[in-house]
Design a protein with these regions (language model features):
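Nucleotide-sugar donor-binding patch of glycosyltransferase catalytic domains
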Residues: 91, 123-163
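A nucleotide-sugar donor-handling region in carbohydrate enzymes
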Residues: 1-54
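Active-site regions of enzymes building and remodeling cell-envelope glycoconjugates
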Residues: 16-27, 87-96, 147-149
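Donor-nucleotide binding loops and adjacent catalytic segments primarily
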Residues: 33-108
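Short loop/helix-cap segments at secondary-structure boundaries that form the rim of catalytic
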Residues: 10-19, 81-90, 121
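A donor-sugar binding/catalytic signature common to diverse glycosyltransferases
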Residues: 97-141
Length: 192
């Protein structure tokens, strides 16, 4: 039997039984101030998120290179389980299961161009820079949609300083709400 609906968490046009509800992003009940306290962020904070593999190590290397220009800020790294090393003047949170909260607490996000991370930054209005893995077409497309290319890594310090001046602009992605409405309506119609 064909299913009633296929729910896809991306923007786009519905067709037949396919419902595109928009991104589904985790939410937090804590305020930004509570989260900053929870993570001990006391200065303006630049979050560097490199994903779960070593593919994003180039971002950390670049941040280490430009560190002297960023000395007045707190630099925090979120990485996969494979990167457990300690860095001087950089806080390495390692692997976290609440990246959305760390993104919300940060003042600027520097990240690979993964779709979920982009959506979480938009949800919480965190100014962000997305550098794709070179040759990874999906990340390159995602980054380009946000106005970035791999070569932007060469002006990362300049971009970070620009982004620190940007106002937060949260955008409720709404996907979870739309998906739950479709499911509730389906359950209600099958109970009658």
């Amino acid at each position: 039997k064909k299913c009633d609906y296929v729910i896809i968490p991306e923007d786009g046009v519905d067709e037949d039984n396919i419902r595109r509800v928009g991104p589904i992003v985790r939410k937090t009940k804590q305020s930004r101030e509570e989260l900053r306290e929870k993570f001990s962020f006391t200065k303006k904070t630049i979050l560097v998120a490199i994903g779960g593999t070593d593919a994003g190590l180039f971002l950390i290397e670049k941040v280490l290179e430009i560190l002297p220009k960023l000395s007045e800020f707190e630099i925090v790294i979120v990485s996969g389980p494979s990167l457990s090393k300690k860095f001087e003047k950089i806080k390495n949170l390692g692997f976290v299961n609440n990246l959305h909260e760390v993104i919300y607490a940060a003042d600027v996000l520097v990240s690979l161009a993964g779709k979920s991370t982009i959506d979480e930054a938009k949800q919480y209005g965190t100014p962000a820079i997305f550098i794709p893995i070179r040759g990874h077409f999906e990340q390159e497309d995602n980054a380009q949609e946000e106005g970035f290319v791999f070569e932007d890594i060469e002006r990362l310090d300049e971009l970070i300083l620009q982004k620190l001046e940007e106002k937060r602009n949260p955008h409720d992605m709404g996907g979870a709400q739309k998906a739950s409405e479709i499911i509730k309506n389906l359950l209600n119609s099958s109970n009658h």
